[in-house]
Amino acid sequence: MSNTTANDDWGKANFNDIYDCPDPRPYFATLGPLEYQIPHHGQAVFRALAHALRCLHPDRTPLNVVDLCCSYGINTALLNYRVTLADLSTRYTSHRLSALPTRHLAAEDRTFFAARRRPEAATATGIDSAARAVGYARAVGLLDHAFAENLEVTEPSPALRRTLAGTDLITVTGGVGYVFTRTFTRLLDSMPTPPWVAAFVLRTVPYRPIADLLARSGLVTEKLPTRTFRQRRFADSAERYAAFDALAVNGLHAAGKEADGFYHTDLYVSRPAPDIAALPLARLL
């Protein structure tokens, strides 16, 4: 099975020490100063897509949403709960919570999120190779199903295959590049009916191989033409120039986008053609 460009070393700073901690506090403490914001942009988009799916397919209640590279369940928190990314950042960098043991923070988080769950919340499945991060999201109730699996390396477990079978929507806000066609092949092989796919993808990473793969399952991929979305500031000049080099390889320019000091993402939405005809992307977003 080919896996065209999945790569663990493509010019981005190494934040491995925050991706698999016992709780999200180091994650927010590190990324906050870099104005990390892509889950904020994802919140409005994923809620709009979930609403559209419920309108087009009212029999799908609750929706089944799979968040790929889910980390601590941030996208799910923003989809299913009355919170913002700013709320979460403030919470996890607050002095009051800074000294709490993880087990006490988890207990507080369970209460915090339970009081803010939206009535139309989707059933949430999270997949990430970071076992402690996924475990925390499951422990505090953000994920209904949590799988610490690396689909770039191994086939889905039987339990994950069973859970994936009823998926309505796949979301991802930054993992493409770390996961690529091999992961998406294994996801689709576990889904009798192809779901919608919404992916925020760094402009430094080509999405065409994944779009072509999705097309073979009957999904048409559209790129939102009107704008890009900031992910976060570059951590340093080395990261900045690596991004510029990657853009050049892809025939893209940084002017008006990455030249502002931020990574920028494109939004790709993949759906069956009848769903696109019923609700064009321009009306949907």
Predicted regions and their residues:
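Class I SAM-dependent methyltransferase Rossmann-like catalytic core
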Residues: 2-64, 72-74, 78-91
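Conserved beta-strand/loop positions that form the S-adenosyl-L-methionine
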Residues: 68
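A short acidic, Gly/Pro-enriched loop at the edge of an enzyme's catalytic core
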Residues: 157-169
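Conserved beta-strand signature within the Rossmann-like core of class I S-adenosyl-L-methionine
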Residues: 191-205
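Conserved class I S-adenosyl-L-methionine
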Residues: 202-222
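Class I S-adenosyl-L-methionine
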Residues: 221-272
